[in-house]
UniProtKB/Swiss-Prot annotation:
Its cofactor is Mg(2+). Its EC number is 2.5.1.21. Belongs to the phytoene/squalene synthase family. GO terms for cellular component: endoplasmic reticulum membrane. Induction: Expression is induced by lovastatin and fluconazole and is repressed by amphotericin B and caspofungin. Expression is repressed during spider biofilm formation. It is an enzyme of class 2 (transferase). This is Squalene synthase ERG9. Pathway: Terpene metabolism; lanosterol biosynthesis; lanosterol from farnesyl diphosphate: step 1/3. Keywords: Endoplasmic reticulum, Isoprene biosynthesis, Lipid biosynthesis, Lipid metabolism, Magnesium, Membrane, Microsome, Multifunctional enzyme, NADP, Steroid biosynthesis, Steroid metabolism, Sterol biosynthesis, Sterol metabolism, Transferase, Transmembrane, Transmembrane helix. GO terms for molecular function: squalene synthase [NAD(P)H] activity. It catalyses: 2 (2E,6E)-farnesyl diphosphate + NADPH + H(+) = squalene + 2 diphosphate + NADP(+); 2 (2E,6E)-farnesyl diphosphate + NADH + H(+) = squalene + 2 diphosphate + NAD(+). It comes from Candida albicans (Yeast). The chain crosses the membrane at residues 420-440. Disulfide bonds: none annotated.
Amino acid sequence: MGKFLQLLSHPTELKAVIQLFGFRQPLHPGKRDVNDKELGRCYELLNLTSRSFAAVIEELHPELRDAVMIFYLVLRALDTIEDDMTIKSSIKIPLLREFDTKLNTKNWTFDGYGPNEKDRTVLVEFDKILNVYHRLKPQYQDIIKSITFKMGNGMADYILDEEFNVYGVATVEDYNLYCHYVAGLVGEGLTNLFVLANFGDKTLTENNFAKADSMGLFLQKTNIIRDYHEDLQDGRSFWPREIWSKYTENLQDFHKVKTPAKEFAGVSCINELVLNALGHVTDCLDYLSLVKDPSSFSFCAIPQVMAVATLAEVYNNPKVLHGVVKIRKGTTCRLILESRTLPGVVKIFKEYIQVINHKSSVRDPNYLKIGIKCGEIEQYCEMIYPNKQALPPSMKSLPENKFTKIVASRESIDLSVQRRIEPGNFNCNVVLFGIGALILSLIYFVLY
C-alpha cells in the first residue's frame, strides 16, 4: 500500500510504471526453442540469480543474448565460490585460479558449498551451463574464458591479501583496482563481445579498455557508497581508508557515534566518495556514444542512469550511514523508459548532476571541488548535444567537436528507436486520458 501511495504522489512515475509494463515494446522479445531444455534451464537459473539482469539480457539482440547470459552465469558461479565462507581456502584458492579450465569440460559440477549459499544452484547444475557454453561461437567462448581467468585469479589474490582482509581497502589506487576486478573486467568482456559482433566501435578497446573499465568502476563505486551500512553489518567495508581516515579514526563510528559532528563527518566522507565516482562519468558517456546496437545500448545505459540517480540520492544524505538508501521504483521505471537513446541518457545525466550540485552545502570540505566537477560534466553534456537556442545570433552553425561525427553517425539509430517509442507513449497517454475522463465523469455523477 505504501508503494502505491508513493506512486500516486508522483504522477509522472505512475505513468512510467503503466507505460513500462503495459505499452513498451521490447526491441528483441526473448523467444527461444521450447524444446531446448538445457538452454531454457540456463535462463531459469539466470532469473533465479538476478531477475533485474535477466530482464535486460533477455531483450538483447539474438546474436549476443545467449553469450551474455552464459557469461553472467559463469561469473555468478565464480562469485558464489568466492563468497562462500564454508569452503576451505585450500580448496577455494586453487578452484578460483583454475576455474577457467572447468570451461574446457562438459560435465563439471560442484557440491562443496555451504547449505545457506543462496546461488548454489548454478554450481549444482553447472554442467547445463557448460552445455550451452560449448554451443557458442569459439570467439565468444574465448572472451568468457579469458575474463573468468583474470577474475578468478584476482579473487584469489584478495583472499590471500591479509592486510586487505584485516584493514579493508587502503588507498584510492587499491579502491580502483578492487573495483576493476569486481566490475571493470565484466565491462572488458562485454566490450569484446560488442565489438566482435559489430555492435560497438573498435575504439572501445583502446587504452586497455579504459572506458569500459570506467563503466564498471562507476557502477561498483556507487554500490559501495550506498551499501556502507549493509556491509558494516556483514563485518566488512570497501570505503578506502585514504578517504575515510580524513573524517574519522574508526569507520564504524559514522554509524555508531550519534552526534551532529560525527554525522557531518560521515556525510562529508560520502560526498568525497561521490566526487571520486563522478570522475568516471565522462568516460561512461564516451562509451555509450560508441555502442551502435540499440539493445546493447539499453543494456549498458540502464545500469549507468540508475547509478547516477543513486549517487544523487546518497549525496549529502546521512541516511546512508544508518540504513539502505534506494531510488524509488517509479523512478526506476522512468529511467528505463528514458534511457533508450543517447539524447535521453545525456539528459538524465545532466538532470542528476544538477541535483547533486544543488544539494551541495557550503560547509562541505569538498564544496568547491564538487561544484567544479558538476560544472565540467554539464559542460560535457552540452558538448555532446549543444543547446542551439543558446547560440549567439552571429553564429550560424554549431562549432564542431569530437562528438560531432559520432552523434551524426548514430543519429539514424536513435531516430529509429525514437520512432518505436512514440506509439507506446501515445497509446499510454490515450488510455490514461480515457481513465481520467471516466473517473471525473463518475465523480460528477456521484456529486451532482
